[in-house]
Amino acid sequence: MPRSLKKGPFVDEHLLAKVDAQNEKGNKNVIKTWSRRSTILPDFIGHTFAVHDGRKHVPVFIDDSMVGHKLGEFAPTKTFKGHVKDDKKGRR
C-alpha cells in the first residue's frame, strides 16, 4: 500500500540538509549515506550517493527516471552467484 499523499515522501532530514547545502554551493560531491529508506526527490537529480548495502557503499548517480523510488532499490544487498549444476557422476 503506497504512502498517503497528504504525508508526502519520506526523506531523512540529514540527507536533505546535505543535498541543500551542496546545491547552494554548486558542489556535486559524493554523499555517503546509510539511509536506504529515503525517497529520491527532484532536488537529488545530478548528485551521486554512496548507498550502503550492508558491506560497502555503492555509488548511485541520480537521474530523472529514479525520482519517486527509494535509494535502497539501486544498491542490491545480495549477490546472486548462479544455480549449482547437478553433478550426476558423484551421486549414486
Swiss-Prot record:
Single GO biological process annotation from the record: translation
Q: Which UniProt keywords apply?
A: Ribonucleoprotein, Ribosomal protein, RNA-binding, rRNA-binding
S-S bonds:
none
The answer to whether keyword RNA-binding applies is yes
Q: Name one GO molecular function term.
A: rRNA binding
Annotated SUPFAM superfamilies: Ribosomal protein S19
The keyword Ribosomal protein belongs to this UniProt entry's keyword annotation:
yes
Gene Ontology cellular-component terms for this entry are: cytoplasm; small ribosomal subunit
Which Pfam families does the UniProt record give? Ribosomal_S19
Regarding protein family, the annotation reads: Belongs to the universal ribosomal protein uS19 family.
In terms of NCBIfam families, this protein maps to: rpsS_bact
State its role.
Answer: Protein S19 forms a complex with S13 that binds strongly to the 16S ribosomal RNA.
Q: Which HAMAP family match?
A: Ribosomal_uS19
- Please give the name of this protein: Small ribosomal subunit protein uS19
Q: Which gene encodes it?
A: rpsS
